[in-house]
Amino acid sequence: VNIREYEKIKTKKYMKNLNLFIVVVHIFSLMFFTIVGKFDYEGDYVLQNVSGLTSLATTVTMSFTTIYVVYLMNKNFIIRYIGKSRERMYLYPSGRDEIFKNKLFTSLSFLSKSFLSIVIIVNILFLFSSRIINISFTGGLIYNLVDILSKSILALIVSFTMITLSNLFGIKLQSTNVALITSVGLVALLGNIVAGTYSISTIYIGLICALMYLSNYLISRYLLSYIFNLDIMNDNKL
């Protein structure tokens, strides 16, 4: 078994509850905002149409999932790059950056499959059931399906960025608590990016996705470079 297959097996084990977590959070979020919209007598448009409700629910799911994944990553492999534990990790033959890259990308790959499949399927089911529960939607079926897909992808990319930044700060400051606190702070700062897309064109959502993807790429490159160049003999090196 090569290192990639080994990391896939480990990731499936420590993220075994992620699918259930995403399902519960997303369905509960949709139900919550739908019920609130029904009792909103002032007629808030966001809470009374499919696009607004799915945007809000996807934002909540992204936020909780990001924090949960950072917690899992802290517990299962980020902690090994903090303090004296990192010395043993850097003795492995495949190299410090290669090991970390496989761990990080395998975790993000697992997250992407789980998040996209669940959020998109649940949102589509919600779209088809909107007539039954008397929720309006604008545009045709294809428009709404593209809208759901684009917002789900944006939420995932934003989540990737927050997770990678949290890991970077955690490793730089040598604290898993810092990583978790950073994830909470980033959710508060960036969470509204997805929620605010309910009223904008899919083209603009695509542009935001491209910018966030570029940001995540640069952050990931910096993080991997930092891991590679980290001097384990100097705890004060930044």
In which residue ranges do the predicted regions lie?
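Hydrophobic alpha-helical transmembrane segments of multi-pass membrane transport proteins
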Residues: 57-87, 118, 214-219
